[in-house]
Structure formats: C-alpha cells, structure tokens
Amino acid sequence: MVPPSAWLGLSGRRQARRRERRIVSTVNALGDLDRYRYMCLATFRRSGAEVATPVWFAASGGKLYVFTAGDSGKVKRLRHTARARVAPSDARGRVQGAWRGATARLVTESQMIERAHAALRAKYGWQVLLGDLFSRLTGRLRRRAWIEVEVEP
C-alpha cells in the first residue's frame, strides 16, 4: 500500500518539517502537552463534581485556546468558576498523561479570538477550515465561545 505522503509528493524530510511547523512547542508551564492533538479539559460544577471533555486546543503566548458551542456545559461551568484541570488525551477522552491544574476564562476580545483561531488553524489546518465552513452554514459560528486556559507551573 502506498503511504499518503507519496500521494502528496512529500519526501520524508519535507513531511517532518511540515509536522514540526504544525506542532508549535512552547517551552514553559505547558511542558509536552502541545505535542498532542487533544486534551481533556476538566471543569467543575457548583457541587464540586468534575466534568472532563476532550477538546482540540492550540498554544499561543504561553496559553492554550479552545473553542466550543456558546451554550455548552463547559461555558456554563466556567461562568461559575475559573478552576480547571488539563491532561493530554485521545479523541475519546482517554487520558494519556498527568493532570495539571489550570485556570480558564471565556475570551470576548476580538483580537484574542483572532489569535486563538490562527493558532488552531496552524495546528489543525484543513480540519479547522472544514469545521468553520459547516459552522457557518448552520449558523453555529456566531454562537461559538472561546476559552483561554492558563496551565499552572
């Protein structure tokens, strides 16, 4: 079977450079979290119960950015408390590393949203563009909420 890189005409070295550009490493409190495609974002209910959700994320300026539906449970819980935890995970939410304490907040400034969106586009490429297209067609793009996560050292 021919690997997909051969279909695209990418040599092994070019493919590796392309992968390195997509995965922006941030040397600070994030550690190796940014090497993963998904992270588990745990937020807390008023009762103190933890609710963990796998999400796409991207690092920019030493912080992590996530987008979600504006009426999601994550958004409701973050309006109550900024306390959160993060851990690298797979798409199904199975944790792949250690949990880290974090502080999360909803982002409303358009400049910060643009920066977060650019970081996600750089990391996930065509997948974000395709998601944006479907969100725009269904009207969900305007109802999108952005979350900034600051991981504790």
Question: PLM features: residue spans?
Answer:
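Short beta-strand segments
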Residues: 36-70, 84-88, 97-101
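Residues at structural and domain junctions
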Residues: 27, 34, 64, 102-106, ...
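Solvent-exposed, well-ordered amphipathic alpha-helical segments
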Residues: 32-34, 54, 59, 111, ...
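Ser/Thr/Pro/Gly-rich low-complexity, intrinsically disordered segments
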Residues: 1-6
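Short, conserved active-site entrance elements at the starts or edges of catalytic domains
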Residues: 7-50, 60
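Short, structured beta-strand-loop surface elements
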Residues: 17, 71-152
